[in-house]
Amino acid sequence: MKLRAVAVLVTLALTACDNPKPRQIPPDPMAKALPPAGPVAPPKDGMTQGLAKRTEVASFYLDRVGEALDPLNKQPAGTPGDAAILMSGFGFDPVAKAPAKGVDVVIDGKAYAAAYGAAREDVANYFKTPGLAATGYAVTLPAGFLVNGPHKVAVRVIAADGKGYFESPAIPFTVD
């Protein structure tokens, strides 16, 4: 019995493929392309002014700050200031488990409106909630918009009913 098992293992080892098929790595849904070179308009003022801050934890993720991917978990997060800075991720109402009315990106205490509703099938699949498929956000800051040095960014997710917002913790980053 042992001899037969050894023979099977040896046969399998000898017939194993030394050149496996090349596999395509699927694109990272969270890694949005960098903004194109060229003029970028300054971001619009945020939408959360006058809304009540909710106490619940925001359901959000900040995928990138410029060239820094996953700045929440990979510190120090740094990006050059001589190019446009894309900040993107996803956010949704954690209480309603539904898309938000919008998202603001708050940089050093100033809120800027983000484009909201980008496709994020990965979010819908992860949370097993098909209604969260359009919860992506992005805001692009023009080159030179932020001075070199340390900054903090937070994400404000506007509740689905539009009556308040959920705010993330501040995430530090540096513009070089």
Describe the role of every protein-language-model region:
Residues A13-A16:
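C-terminal motif of bacterial Sec signal peptides marking the signal peptidase cleavage site
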Residues L9-T11, A37:
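Short intrinsically disordered, low-complexity segments
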Residues K2-V8:
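Sec-dependent signal peptide recognition
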Residues V8-L9, A98:
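Residue-level detector of transmembrane insertion/anchoring sites
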Residues R23-K32:
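Intrinsically disordered, low-complexity segments enriched in small/polar and acidic residues
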